[in-house]
Amino acid sequence: MDRRIEPYLAFAGEVDRATARLRERHPGAVRCRAGCDLCCRDFFPITALEADGVRQGLELLPDFLRESVRRRARAAVDELARRGIDPARLDDAARALAGTPHALCPMNEGGLCTVYDHRPIVCRT
């Protein structure tokens, strides 16, 4: 693993612990649970460091699972191209794919995150 990501993963662990404390103190306030994929159905920006963490998580996956993620990501990009939308324009992409199967995060496999330990901060809260 790239050691540059270690401080980020430590921070992500702190976020996880804080979220767990919130869930404990205020049941129902934090809706995230294992198998919940509501946040996987939206578009949001992530930092370059988070993207690197996701990349590292993808590298740890078995080949068949990594290829499945790539196929889903490619399908979303292809759908945007079919509609004439630049995938780098996040707002346009989000509007175009909202309500379609392509809106689901490509890392989501059957309602679970394939890169769970390397997911971005927004996916942890």
PLM regions with names:
Residues 1-125:
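Hydrophobic scaffolds flanking metal-cofactor catalytic centers in soluble metalloenzymes
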